[in-house]
Amino acid sequence: FSTTAKTALVIDNTTGEVLLSKDIDRPIPPASMSKLMTLWMVFESLDEGKIELDDTLRVSRKAWGKGGSKMFLREGEYVTIKNLIKGVIIQSGNDACIVLAEGLAGTEENFAELMTIRAKEIGLRSSNFTNSTGWPDPEHKMSSKDLITLANKIREEYPSYYEIFDDLEFT
């Protein structure tokens, strides 16, 4: 295999065999793949009993007004954590990410700092987060190796939530 991509990592999840590896530790802008770390933080909070799927969070003006992909939440409405998770996974909702970030850490900025700290603790060495959505920022980066590591950790450590990733639509 070969690729013109700056960085790439393809692994056979059944055998663990590396099929393609190119500059896998190079930090790059991860865009919406950052949302995997947002979900990790939410899943961890759920498992620790800090929040529950049926808890509701209020949509802030910031979340409502965020551009890009969204769940189309309305400012001031309350949404369950379960529906916010679906909004992140199925609709790649920037608004849903921000509501979750604010609900867990007070502000998205605080949440991004916690994301970076936790990422290092779980072995993501090339990751730095400035927001919960992957919105472009020169300091917001992840490597291919970190992305695969995180995806595998979510699959292994939070199997009870993994079925949501199979859903194709959400209304």
Where are these regions (language model features)?
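Extracytoplasmic
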Residues: D146-T171
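Active-site-adjacent loops and short helices of periplasmic peptidoglycan-processing enzymes
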Residues: F1-K145, N152-E156
